[in-house]
Curated annotation (Swiss-Prot):
It is found in: Cytoplasm. Catalyzes the attachment of L-aspartate to tRNA(Asp) in a two-step reaction: L-aspartate is first activated by ATP to form Asp-AMP and then transferred to the acceptor end of tRNA(Asp). It comes from Aliivibrio fischeri (strain MJ11) (Vibrio fischeri). This is Aspartate--tRNA ligase. Residues 195-198 are annotated as: Aspartate. ATP binds at residues 217-219, 226, 482, 534-537. The keyword Zinc does not apply. GO terms for cellular component: cytoplasm. Homodimer. InterPro entries: Aa-tRNA-synt_II (IPR004364), aa-tRNA-synth_II (IPR006195), aa-tRNA-synth_II/BPL/LPL (IPR045864), Asp-tRNA-ligase_1 (IPR004524), Asp-tRNA-ligase_1_N (IPR047089), Asp/Asn-tRNA-synth_IIb (IPR002312), AspRS_core (IPR047090), GAD-like_sf (IPR004115).
Length: 591
């Protein structure tokens, strides 16, 4: 039906007759001529309809926004005075010789000239996606997927599919369950990742695997999460963690260069402990210059229990953030930041303004200064390298609360005070994660997943002191977003059984849930390691947006609903009966 895309017309086509298909972006009647801005996925071109072409002119006079149309015409170069430098096709226009209305459009439920609500945009997503901004994002995502396949194919990785209907395994979130009609009362689970199948592929001898795959997690959503999401899943045999990092870093480096013409450089590597100490996060945004500084040793002997208590608690932490020029913050602003850290469990936010650094103790202003002697204050000023005009903000509590609260405050200050360089790219690797983390009841949980190999310890050593072990795991972080995570996997049954035991999974449960894996580990399993990227998050960063819904064609809401199709919906009673399922809804309690 067409010979060219609207957005691809240029001066090299001058004098040629072309056929275009697309939509009316805008219609203007000027000086007896009709001008149509015609749009397709590649862009917009101006079409001129001359009244001398009576039949065409008559049809063109009926056009309204979003009519689906076909134009035939001659490409001609615009006079210099009429060149539109704001359009990629601004040097040319199409002189129409034929026009067909393929389909008319009703009045649009969205107005492209104003901001529409998120609900309306999702309900009429097929219209929202016509906007050039949205179309460009989906196209860039497609280019990213194509690049990944090409890169991995060239590096001898095999694209292998794994099952979607599989067995529920504990991977940190709730599973989406699918009832079996044949095996009544039994359920499949949609995969949270292809983790075990890709490990089994390594045991099968396919030493370089990849897959761009849908995964599913029934968890509470936020801006960078969806119930169904897309992973770039990678697994290798006979490669160390360093070698896996090298090839996947090169993938991202080359992707940014090809798609954005951005040179990322070599990614720095940072241990988990350093990331938490300096930034209060295992996915630090290195574009932000603010850092956490520990001062527990300086305040452990003061009479102020708010500081000395955590300073003398082995599970406590006292850390500060020095904000250059922050002494200009008002008391109201400081109180608002105090309320902000309260969201993360902090009991308050002590502060100290440095009005005159040269005056030392006499030059600071703080409600807690009276509890601190001159020696302590001078030591804090020295350690933080504070200068006149700065403010020092204090966090003192359990280490986890301080790290999370002050880490979040660091990000907020970076945004509010425009300290974060939003034009920069700051990738890094975070490595040497703890093997396990403790919940509030003292139970250990795998920080990544239970198939991650510990770093440099035997099964016996791990069992003797599991809380001290680190894992051979690694996360790729870009601008404060974890875009990929992976690890070396356990490749012998003894270590895997030991890890299950530490996690409180008894022998019988191990066999019920993971018997197939433990059996497979008996038969010459190679050492293997891998990584999975979140394609949605990568695309989000590439497109310069902050919400993965912007780079997914048909996303869900934060309530995991599809406003376009009204999913999820009630099932047909006959279907439920066939599956031997009865739905019992919780009764609403009277107020």
């Amino acid at each position: 039906m067409r010979t060219h895309y609207c957005g691809n017309l240029n001066k090299s086509l001058a004098g040629q007759t072309v056929e275009l298909c697309g939509w009316v972006n805008r219609r203007r009647d000027l000086g007896g001529l009709i001008f149509i801005d015609m749009r397709d996925r590649e862009g917009i071109v101006q079409v001129v309809v001359d009244p001398d072409m009576k039949d065409v002119f008559e049809v063109a006079s009926q056009l309204r926004n979003e009519f689906c149309i076909k134009f035939t015409g001659e490409v001609r170069v615009r006079p210099d005075s009429q060149v539109n430098k704001d359009m990629a096709t601004g040097e040319v226009e199409l002189l129409a010789t034929g026009l067909e209305i393929i389909n008319r459009s009703a009045a649009l439920p969205l107005d492209f000239n104003q901001t529409n609500s998120e609900e309306q945009r999702l309900k009429y997503r097929y219209i929202d996606l016509r906007r050039p901004e949205m179309s460009d994002r989906i196209k860039l995502r497609a280019r990213a997927s194509s690049f990944v396949r090409r890169f991995l194919d060239e590096n001898l990785f095999l694209d292998i599919e794994t099952p979607v209907l599989t067995k529920a395994t504990p991977e940190g979130a709730r599973d989406y369950l699918v009832p079996s009609r044949v095996h009544k009362g039994s359920f499949y689970a949609l995969p949270q990742s292809p983790q075990l199948f890709k490990q089994l592929l390594m045991m099968s001898g396919f030493d370089r695997y990849y897959q761009i795959v849908k995964c599913f997690r029934d968890e509470d959503l936020r801006a960078d999460r969806q119930p169904e999401f897309t992973q770039i899943d990678i697994e290798t045999s006979f490669m160390t963690s360093q070698e896996v990092r090298n090839v996947t870093e090169r993938l991202v480096h080359d992707m940014w260069k090809e798609l954005l013409d951005v040179e990322l450089g070599q990614f720095p590597v940072m241990p988990f402990s350093e990331a938490m100490r300096r930034f209060g996060s295992d996915k630090p945004d290195l574009r932000n210059p603010l850092e956490l500084v520990d001062v527990a040793d300086l305040v452990k002997d003061v009479d102020f229990k708010v500081f000395s208590g955590p300073a003398n608690d082995e599970k406590g932490r006292v850390a500060v953030i020095r904000v250059s020029g922050g002494a200009s913050l008002s008391r109201k602003q400081i109180d608002e930041y105090g309320n902000f850290v309260g969201i993360y469990g902090a009991k308050g936010l002590a502060w100290m303004k440095v009005n005159d650094r040269a005056a030392g103790f006499e030059g600071v202003q703080s409600p807690v200064a009276k509890f601190l002697n001159e020696e302590v204050i001078n030591a804090i000023l020295e350690r933080t390298q504070a200068e006149t005009g700065d403010i020092i903000l204090f966090g003192a509590d359990k280490a986890g609360i301080v790290s999370e609260a002050m880490g979040a405050l660091r990000l907020k200050l970076g945004t509010d005070l425009e300290l974060t360089d939003t034009s920069a790219w700051a990738p890094l690797w975070v490595v040497d994660f703890p093997m396990f983390e403790e919940d509030g009841e003292g139970n250990l949980h795998a920080m990544h997943h239970p198939f991650t190999s510990p770093l440099g310890v035997s099964a016996e050593e791990l069992q003797a002191n599991p809380a001290a072990a680190n894992s051979d795991a690694y996360d790729m972080v870009i601008n404060g977003y974890e875009v990929g995570g992976g690890s070396v996997r356990i490749h012998n049954a003894e270590m895997q059984t030991a890890v299950f035991g530490i996690l409180g999974i008894e022998a019988q449960e191990q066999q019920e849930k993971f018997g197939f894996l433990l059996e497979a580990l008996k038969y010459g399993t190679p050492p293997h390691a891998g990584l999975a990227f979140g394609l949605d998050r990568l695309a989000m960063l590439l497109c310069g947006t902050e919400n993965i819904r912007d780079v997914i064609a048909f996303p869900k809401t934060t309530a995991a609903a599809c406003l376009l199709t009204d999913a999820p919906s009630l099932a047909n009673p006959a279907s439920l009966e066939e599956l031997a399922i009865a739905v019992k809804l919780a009764e609403k309690k009277d107020a």
